């Protein structure tokens, strides 16, 4: 299906953004692409887990598309610093813990990832898969550019101050009691990240401060160019 979408985009000169690339074969289709209107996105679960992890997490790890082999995961990580990957997303799709305990074929697809998505990417930075400017490029600037989001995705005068301040040298242990998800589960529970989130700003307001939500919601309608 990915190959067909790319062929149609080339044939008709239209744009296509391939979501949730999960295999080495899909990466090959995106390699050496002379068409700037054809781009691809990778999600946190496919960068972080492989089919080896199903025995431990079972239905909690079920997502669509499914996580693939260890080799696929490694190739996705290696592609982060190349133009094969245009953007990085969370694919955050929570379901209740009870729903995810059903038999694999009966439980819904989707994992929780948004709270620890940035920490996951910083961990890959520590492992030398990606540098800090590219994390910002592919998690903020490129998505805002692709979807023509007005005054977002950059730190510049006149733009909304949506940003994160991190401590690259302070570890974070993921504990259930620290989760902000209503479903109260995550596949990274018990993991230790080398970095931590210190502050989060939304529209110039501090909404997260050293592990605590500090403000009432400060969201605004997103405008498009």
Per-range role (PLM):
Residues 16, 41, 91, 121, ...:
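Residue-level signal for inorganic ion chemistry
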Residues 1-3, 7-13, 81-88, 93-168:
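His/Asp/Glu-enriched, well-ordered alpha-helical/loop segment
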Residues 26-32, 216-225:
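C-terminal/domain-terminus segments
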Residues 15-18, 62-68, 122-127, 147-148, ...:
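Short, well-ordered beta-strand elements within core beta-sheets of diverse protein domains
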Residues 61-73, 108-112, 186-192:
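A short acidic, glycine-rich active-site loop
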Residues 54-62, 99-107, 179-184:
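Short glycine/proline- and charge-enriched loop/turn segments
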Residues 1-88:
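Histidine/acidic residue-rich metal-binding segments in metalloenzymes
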Residues 103, 160-222:
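C-terminal cap of metal-dependent C-N hydrolases
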């Amino acid at each position: 299906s990915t190959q067909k979408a790319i062929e149609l985009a080339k044939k008709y000169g239209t744009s296509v953004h391939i979501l949730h690339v999960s295999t080495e074969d899909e990466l090959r289709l995106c390699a050496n692409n002379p068409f700037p209107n054809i781009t691809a996105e990778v999600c946190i679960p496919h960068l972080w887990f492989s089919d080896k992890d199903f025995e431990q997490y079972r239905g909690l790890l079920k997502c669509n598309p499914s996580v693939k082999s260890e080799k696929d995961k490694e190739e996705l990580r290696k592609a982060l610093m190349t133009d094969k990957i245009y953007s990085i997303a969370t694919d955050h799709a929570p379901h209740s813990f009870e729903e995810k305990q059903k038999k694999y074929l009966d439980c819904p697809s989707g994992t929780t990832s948004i709270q620890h998505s940035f920490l996951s990417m910083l961990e890959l930075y520590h492992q030398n898969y990606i540098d800090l400017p590219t994390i910002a490029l592919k998690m903020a600037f490129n998505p805002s550019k692709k979807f023509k989001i007005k005054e977002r995705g950059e730190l510049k005068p006149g733009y909304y101050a949506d940003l994160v301040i991190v401590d690259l040298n302070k570890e974070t242990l993921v504990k259930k009691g620290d989760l902000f998800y209503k479903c109260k589960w995550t596949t990274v529970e018990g993991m230790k990240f080398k970095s931590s989130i210190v502050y989060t700003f939304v529209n110039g307001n501090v909404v997260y401060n050293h592990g605590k939500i500090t403000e009432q919601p400060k969201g605004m309608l997103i405008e498009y160019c």
